[in-house]
A protein has these predicted regions:
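Extracellular/lumenal and peripheral-membrane lipid-interaction modules
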Residues: 1-167
Length: 167
């Protein structure tokens, strides 16, 4: 016991216990997931927010929805290529859009979605650029946490986020 106490005082200057280093304004946790689990989480969020449609993550992001055409409901499909940005946000570059079996101009459908659906403020649709900008850092979580995407490689099922909790 004497050796333990002596070594403590030898390695701690002035006999004071070092304080933990402050690493920033948040406590960061890295979360790794897979396509199947993230697909389930996204679809749960869509249901809770009453956003009609479903997402499927395979080698790309696929969104399925329905739209009224005359008196009929038709299913549409949008495919996106995701890209994680260094600031923690996510860009979804639109690859294709189809309504039933008809392929439509991407910018037209994105403009339709932007004006028709009530999307969260942190989802920015840019029809002219053919992309959806997902500002994850502006997403409001109940506990004040912030989300940043680290990796979003669907082909290799390598998906990770950092959750930053306020101190």
């Amino acid at each position: 016991a004497f050796v333990l106490v002596l070594s403590f005082f030898l390695f701690v200057p002035d006999g004071r216990v070092p304080k933990p280093e402050k690493t920033g304004k948040t406590i960061d946790l890295r979360v790794e997931t897979n396509k199947a689990d993230l697909t389930a989480l996204i679809n749960r969020y869509l249901r809770e927010e009453k956003i009609k449609g479903k997402v499927l993550l395979n080698d790309e992001v696929v969104y399925y929805g329905t739209v009224g055409v005359f008196s009929e409901k038709m299913q549409y499909k949008m495919t996106f290529k995701p890209k994680a940005l260094k600031n923690g946000d996510l860009v979804l570059k639109q690859k294709s859009v189809s309504l039933g079996s008809v392929h439509l101009p991407v910018s037209y459908i994105l403009k339709f979605v932007k004006t028709t659906y009530h999307l969260p403020k942190w989802v920015i649709i840019q029809p002219g650029e053919k992309l959806v900008y997902v500002q994850l850092q502006n997403m409001k979580l109940e506990n004040g946490a912030k989300v940043k995407v680290n990796e979003f490689d669907l082909q290799h099922d390598d998906i990770s986020f950092t959750l930053g909790f306020p101190k």
